[in-house]
Amino acid sequence: MQTSICSPSSSSSLAILKLNQNPLLGHTVSPRFPLKRRPASTTRARLSAHRESVLKDFQDRRALKIISGLQNLDRENVASVVTAADKGGATHVDIACDAELVKLATSLTTLPVCVSSVDPAQFLPAVEAGALMVEIGNYDSFYEAGIVFSADQILNLTKETRRLLPSVVLSVTVPHTLGLPDQVKLAELLEQEGADIIQTEGGKCSHPSKSGVLGLIEKAAPTLAAAYSVSRAVKIPVMCSSGLSSVTAPMAITAGAAGVGVGSAVNKLNDVVAMIAEVRSIADSLAPSAARLSRPDGAFLKM
């Protein structure tokens, strides 16, 4: 069995994102991060009050976050994804960082809403609109444009986000373009800077050589390996994302993840009923693993 899994590319072969020259953001981002207004005191109080509930499913190792996509501003599709997450048994929903989309999502579900961006300033209006969690991640659309993020850039984005939003639950994705040792090192630094959750990814360059179940396992191998390695280096929860299915989601929990993130398996479907069924299938697949690992004798599985 042969699997073609892309290895991290050198800086000479891939463009490195310059934060003040980002073609995918709607405005120029200053590399010095000019002073931005902080959220109102009522927003800070709300975030502090909700932290425990947002993190509970991660602590129970049963979190399931359904992702609509960082660049997905299609209200109809986002509404379908949010509805599927709500009705299918997910614990969180992740949408693009847009205040109006947050208002739409919170009108459809009581699940914690996470917003994704690579611009810390964009988080503020989304959080004030009702988002309870922010994510520096969902880099797929950038990779498609040949843009990758360095460890230093991710670390700086994390520092600035934590400065602007000291109370918000903060998840940060470790880029798969880094080698595993560098992913682990970055995760440790992110934990020191106040990240609450580390998310792993597998990228879109894993091409299974087999179909069916074998192919699903091959596709998930990179992010499963990252979740295994990172979860043993940090004390905060790890979320495993990219290329997961009902077959491989339980493997992520056994590997050490506290939850899984699922995007294209759901948001690429054309029918909300099919979306709900897919979310339910993944949620049901997680239940036995979460229950087993919550038992006192389940500790042996994480060695």
Model-predicted segments: where are they?
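Short N-terminal leader segment in a subset of presequences, especially plant chloroplast
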Residues: 8-17
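Alpha/beta enzyme core
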Residues: 2-7, 20-41, 46-240, 244-303
